Amino acid sequence: MKKGFTLIELLVVIAIIAILASVVVVAFPGATKKAKDSRIVSAISQARTVMVYVYGNDGNYDNYSCTVPADEMPPLCAEVANNHPTKGTNPTIATCTTCDVNSGPAACIYSLLNAKASYWYCADSTGKAGFTGTDPSTACAGAASAKCPADITG
């Protein structure tokens, strides 16, 4: 009596493994998008720390951008750009000197996310940071505000 598996038994096991692997591969893109979103959120959170540092040193946000190498923003902007739904798109940064009568300088940074359509992550100089379904371009990028939308959820 010989011991071992027949060719048919091995083929059946390989077929079962292939079916299980295909189920995992179908679920994989969602996980990839969530991982990219986590990288974007992390980079923007670090960029908010840089925002506080720039204001503390300069008293304004004039040097808070993706192009000023001294403030450590270029690598953070590159991280967002590499994980943005439209690869290569930097986060949007907005600053204003006198946003309104009652406040001084302000800044905000935001980026579109991958996992949910029309969903952004935004952080601003007032301490607000979180997810929003409202396009931040009107509030954050508006020269009179530079603040995240009111519906931010953490």
PLM region descriptions:
Residues 1-28:
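N-terminal single-pass transmembrane signal-anchor helix
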Residues 30-82:
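Conserved hydrophobic/amphipathic alpha-helical signal-anchor segments
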Residues 39, 101-104:
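A generic fold-level signal
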Residues 52, 95, 108-111:
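Structural recognition of the beta-strand scaffold that forms the well-ordered cores
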Residues 61-102, 124-125, 141-142, 149-154:
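Polar, enzyme-active/binding microenvironments
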Residues 103-154:
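Short, surface-exposed interaction loops/tails
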